[in-house]
C-alpha cells in the first residue's frame, strides 16, 4: 500500500512539473509574440506618419502658381476604346500648324509619308514636300547641292539649330511638337487649355519678367509664347468656322496623331485580338465540358481473373 501511494505521489509531482514547464514556455512565447506585434504596429504607425507628413509637404508645394492650373477633362472624339481619330480634324490641324505654329515649332519625328492616307492624298503630300529644299549629295567638285523634298523626308523645322532658335525667341527654346501631347501631363486637355487659356490681362499682383506672357495653365504662370490663335486667323479649306477653340481643337488633334500615328491601327488590332481570344476561350469551354470532362472523370475497373482450379 505504501508503495502505491509513493507511485501516485511521484506521478502527480512529475505531471505538475511538466505542466509548469509547458506553461512557462507558452507564457514566454506569448510575451515574445506580443512584443513582435507591438513592434510591428509601432513601425507601421511611424511609416504611415512619415508618409502622411511627406504627402502634406508635397501637397503644399504643388500649388497652381508653381505647377500650373489643372486642365479640365474634355470629351475628345478619339478617347473611347472603339473610337478613332477625326481625320478631317487632322487635316485642319495640319493647316493650323503650317500657317501658325511652324514659324517657331518643329516636327522632327514626323515624315511626309505618314500624312498619306491620313489627312492628304499622295499627290498633295508630294507637292507639299517639294515646296522645301533638302541637302543633297555634293557634286563632283564637292559643292553642296539642294533637291526638292520627297515623301521619305521629315518635315523641316523653322531653325537650323538650337542657337538660332534661341536667338530668334529672346533666349527661349520652342519645343519640338512631335511628342508634345505625350510629354505633358494632361495630354490633349493641357494643350487645348494652354492655347485657349490666355487672359486679356494678368491678375492683379502678378509680376511677369520682360517678354513673358501670363497663362494660368503653364507652370509658374509665365510663358514666353504669346497668344497665337485668334478668331478667323485661318481660312479652312472645308469652310469650317475658324474660331479660336476650333483651331485649338484641330491642332491638338493633329499633334496627338503626330505623337501616336498608330492609334487607329492599334485599336483595330486590339478589337480583332479580343474577338479572336474570346472565340478561343468559348471553344476551350466547349472542349472542356464536352470532350475533356468525360476523359478526366472516367474510371477503370480491373477485375483480376479467377485462378483456375
From Swiss-Prot:
Which Pfam families does the protein's record reference? Cytochrom_C1 (PF02167)
What is the membrane topology noted in the UniProt record heading this document? Single-pass membrane protein
Q: Sorted alphabetically, which PROSITE patterns does this protein's record hold?
A: CYTC
Enzyme Commission (EC) number = 7.1.1.8
Q: Which InterPro entries match?
A: Cyt_c-like_dom, Cyt_c-like_dom_sf, Cyt_c1, Cyt_c1_TM_anchor_C
The annotated transit peptide is positioned at 1-61
Bias category Acidic residues: which stretches? 131-140
Q: Which residues bind heme c?
A: 101, 104-105, 225
In this entry, the parts of the chain located on the Mitochondrial intermembrane side of the membrane are 62-262
Q: How is the cofactor bound?
A: Binds 1 heme c group covalently per subunit.
User: What UniProt keywords are attached to this protein's entry?
Assistant: Electron transport, Heme, Iron, Membrane, Metal-binding, Mitochondrion, Mitochondrion inner membrane, Respiratory chain, Transit peptide, Translocase, Transmembrane, Transmembrane helix, Transport
Task: Name a single GO cellular component.
Answer: cytosol
Q: Does the keyword Translocase feature in the UniProt annotation?
A: yes
Quote the catalytic activity from the record. a quinol + 2 Fe(III)-[cytochrome c](out) = a quinone + 2 Fe(II)-[cytochrome c](out) + 2 H(+)(out)
Give a GO molecular function annotation for the protein: heme binding
The record's subcellular locations are:
Mitochondrion inner membrane
In terms of one coarse class, where is the protein primarily found? mitochondrion
User: Which positions, given as ranges, span the membrane?
Assistant: 263-296
Function, in words: Component of the ubiquinol-cytochrome c oxidoreductase, a multisubunit transmembrane complex that is part of the mitochondrial electron transport chain which drives oxidative phosphorylation.
Additional remark text: Present with 39900 molecules/cell in log phase SD medium.
Q: What is this protein called?
A: Cytochrome c1, heme protein, mitochondrial
Native source species: Saccharomyces cerevisiae (strain ATCC 204508 / S288c) (Baker's yeast)
Amino acid at each position: 500500500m505504501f508503495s502505491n501511494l509513493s507511485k501516485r505521489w511521484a506521478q502527480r509531482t512529475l505531471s505538475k512539473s511538466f505542466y509548469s514547464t509547458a506553461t512557462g514556455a507558452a507564457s514566454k512565447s506569448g510575451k515574445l509574440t506580443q512584443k513582435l506585434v507591438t513592434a510591428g504596429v509601432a513601425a507601421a504607425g511611424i511609416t504611415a506618419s512619415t508618409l502622411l507628413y511627406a504627402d502634406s509637404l508635397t501637397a503644399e508645394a504643388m500649388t497652381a502658381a508653381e505647377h500650373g492650373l489643372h486642365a479640365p477633362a474634355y470629351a475628345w472624339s478619339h478617347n473611347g476604346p472603339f473610337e478613332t481619330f477625326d481625320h478631317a480634324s487632322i487635316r485642319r490641324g495640319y493647316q493650323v500648324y503650317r500657317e501658325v505654329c511652324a514659324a517657331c515649332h518643329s516636327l522632327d519625328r514626323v515624315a511626309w509619308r505618314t500624312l498619306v492616307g491620313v489627312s492628304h492624298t499622295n499627290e498633295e503630300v508630294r507637292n507639299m514636300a517639294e515646296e522645301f529644299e533638302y541637302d543633297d549629295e555634293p557634286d563632283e567638285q564637292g559643292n553642296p547641292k539642294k533637291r526638292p523634298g520627297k515623301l521619305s523626308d521629315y518635315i523641316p523645322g523653322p531653325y537650323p539649330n538650337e542657337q538660332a532658335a534661341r536667338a530668334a525667341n529672346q533666349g527661349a527654346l520652342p519645343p519640338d511638337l512631335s511628342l508634345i501631347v505625350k510629354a505633358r501631363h494632361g495630354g490633349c486637355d493641357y494643350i487645348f487649355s494652354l492655347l485657349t487659356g490666355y487672359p486679356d490681362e494678368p491678375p492683379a499682383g502678378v509680376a511677369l519678367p520682360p517678354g513673358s506672357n501670363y497663362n494660368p495653365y503653364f507652370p509658374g504662370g509665365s510663358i514666353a509664347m504669346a497668344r497665337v490663335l485668334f478668331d478667323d486667323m485661318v481660312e479652312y479649306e472645308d469652310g469650317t468656322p475658324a474660331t479660336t477653340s476650333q483651331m485649338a481643337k484641330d491642332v491638338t488633334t493633329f499633334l496627338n496623331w503626330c505623337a501616336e500615328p498608330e492609334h487607329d491601327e492599334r485599336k483595330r488590332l486590339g478589337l480583332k485580338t479580343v474577338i479572336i481570344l474570346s472565340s478561343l476561350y468559348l471553344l476551350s469551354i466547349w472542349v472542356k465540358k464536352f470532350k475533356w470532362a468525360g476523359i478526366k472523370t472516367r474510371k477503370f475497373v480491373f477485375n483480376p481473373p479467377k485462378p483456375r482450379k
